[in-house]
Regions:
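Ribosome-associated RNA-binding proteins
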Residues: 1-126
Length: 126
């Protein structure tokens, strides 16, 4: 069964909406990638217009930006300490945009969308 991003079939009261169109391909959705803290795994997905999207399924490293020196550095991720998207993601070690990660250089906030971009970019928190 396909995941759709269209309007639901039922109203909040439980009554049914009247159908005015069929399901369309552009309404197609996918399940989240839920990027984990493990050995690097990447999945390339075909999107509309024969474009591609890189799904990062798991990774151990992050591209860390230091605002003081204004330089990037690739560092190893130790653990995920906070995730504003879902509090249960912390114990499952799932990374999303806005997550706070503990790295070799200290704590950092993820600025990229790992499930969409295929990389983990982060900014060092002082």
């Amino acid at each position: 069964m396909a995941i759709t991003q269209s309007r639901p079939k039922r109203k909040q009261t439980g009554a049914r909406y009247k159908d005015y169109k069929k399901k369309k391909q552009y309404e197609l959705g996918r399940s989240p990638s839920l990027t984990k803290l493990e050995k690097r795994r990447l999945k390339i997905i075909r999107t509309m217009g024969n474009n591609q999207k890189a799904r990062l399924l798991s990774t151990e490293t992050a591209n860390l930006f230091d605002p003081k020196t204004k330089k990037y550095e690739q560092v190893k991720i130790k653990t995920i300490t906070d995730n504003p998207a879902n509090r249960h993601f912390v114990r499952r070690n799932i990374m999303t945009k806005g997550s706070i990660i503990d790295t070799e250089r200290g704590k950092a906030r993820i600025t990229s969308r790992p499930g969409q971009d295929g990389t983990v970019n982060a900014v060092l928190i002082s």
